[in-house]
């Protein structure tokens, strides 16, 4: 059934826009240039408002997910990377459940990637229609069918641009992946803004600056009681404070420390005697994939819950899925879950919230740990990084594990890889929960993504440097 399904969609994949693989090796400085161009296009799209919207001042139902999904409200980047990640999530689950069987041949892999792109485009159209018809930009009946169609087309074209930018980097023209680059950029931008934002907010304590560091100097300069001013700068509520910044730096350090955990399996050449090496299996074997897929799952649940709440408010089943409330305390208007499944799957806002509702905290912990471990273990089976795939790669390179025959390599690798994937996903989920409870800026999930992505780019840079031989060879 799996192969038949991929064959059915093959004609559709053939007409999709595609970035051709480079015919020559792309130099590092060219990769940096293409990566910078990708980043520039994304940042420009984040600033271009959608044409035809009547209002985007209502409570933002997806405020909590925008940092993670590289989304910016009311702009061309309204959908961010959500369609791509959702498509990957669906295809991964279908392949993991053996509903779609993906072979090891390049043809099957290419067809699977084409199916992901096709579903990404379909999901982009679907999400655009949902956003418009649920009144996020104004009452559809007042805007008219023409304006609604124009907004949907804008969102679709922007989503297609994101798909192609991601493919551009994935094909080897740039560094890393487009998804990772856009996520890291958005999260780092948020952290810098929350630290140094000059925007003023009217609170019950008077006018304050949004940025935590700017607020520190402002409070010290304007308050006569310096001790109280310091206390407010460190612990003020509903706005970024210095404890949030300290927690963010602490989580950065912890994640970087865990990045170094790995098991080195000794391997040797089957052709040349005396040629030894090691194959590293990292603790974070699947890197940030589990947290990205978990974010996609939750964000789509939020979309469905918000859509149903708008249309069928008061319905028992809808309320069971999630009930929502609006707030504008300490920032832009936003909607947040106050009941139902969505509430229990959302992170507590602070450590105080954990103490106020320990059941919520416990369910959230179980969900995060379980989902990250599940997605991590499932991902290795569909991404070509399982024990069988690694053994095949080593065999093609004419390498064998020391003390083991070729036939027993899969069995030996199976002792490490699935365990590393599941336990690594568990650790990723645990670190995300810790960051949420400590109040790190950008959410625990966001911080985890930013650190792992930045570390990936550091490893890419080191690898390119070793291949070029020197720092000067990278750019000149």
Swiss-Prot record:
Xref: Pfam families: Plug_translocon, SecY
Matches recorded under Gene3D superfamilies: SecY subunit domain (1.10.3370.10)
Keywords for this protein: Developmental protein, Endoplasmic reticulum, Membrane, Protein transport, Translocation, Transmembrane, Transmembrane helix, Transport
Cytoplasmic topology ranges: 2-33, 97-117, 166-172, 262-288, 376-420, 463-476
NCBIfam families according to UniProt: 3a0501s007, PRK08568.1-5
Family: Belongs to the SecY/SEC61-alpha family.
Protein name stated in the entry: Protein transport protein Sec61 subunit alpha
